[in-house]
Amino acid sequence: MTARFVALYETPADPETFDQHYHRIHIPLARRLPGLRRYTVGRDVTAVRGAPYYMLVELEWDTLDELRSAFASPEGRATASDAARLQELATVRSMIFVGRQAM
């Protein structure tokens, strides 16, 4: 069982500015989150319904408690503060879920 944070970004008004900020500032901050096991970024995400997403991000921890602790840490607060800046550049939907392998 793993805990995951997922963010779906809509296409930003200025993709170049968004990409530069995300890759130069946000990724280095998020990589320091305690207990982070995996950080995946997907581009040109095709939606089954509606408009495609610009980018999908998935961060994974071993447990929900570890995810919560990471978000409450100084590194988590710094990452969340920067995420607020990203939300000025692109609309984002985010969620947390606990996953269990089905197969």
Report each predicted region and the residues it spans.
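Macromolecular interaction modules
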Residues: M1-M103
